[in-house]
Amino acid sequence: INTVLPFGNTLSIVKVTGAELLEALEASTYCTPTSIGGFPQVSGIEFTVDTTKAYDQGEQYPGSTYYGPKSIQRVTIETVGGEPFDANATYTIATNDFMAAGGDTYYAFAAASVNYDLGLSMDEVVMDYITDELKGTVTEEAYGQPAGRITVDQGLAFTDVAATSPYYDGIEWA
């Protein structure tokens, strides 16, 4: 557990509008498909990142090396909690204290209407979940495949390949 949660973070709750959630996801996926440490790890939400569109970089977040989005171009949220996304709704997000304070690309969370650090160690919360909810077992069958919460649309990076090309069969298969 400490290998995947090495920073000693605590569990926080933030309440954000749909628009703030959308900003946070747009900012945290600004360089997708290139990876960064701040890429969102989500549950209870389904969204798409369209990497064929450029990130519309706005102002630099205060005290950060990251820039907020000037406009939302790449991210579309389909559902939150199994319900259609509403930019005007208020959503309750469980996250860590670093992100709740606006760390990495999550500056939108710092201004949340409710921002409360529960003081519970993230590694202990995850251990309790594995022990109590999963009865101590994490299986490949249950957790070994992507859950489909995040779709990354990369478009096609190449033009059509001629049927006479030696690569045609492999590309057609892919």
Spans of model-derived segments:
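Catalytic centers of hydrolytic enzymes
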Residues: 1-155
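N-terminal propeptides
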Residues: 155-174
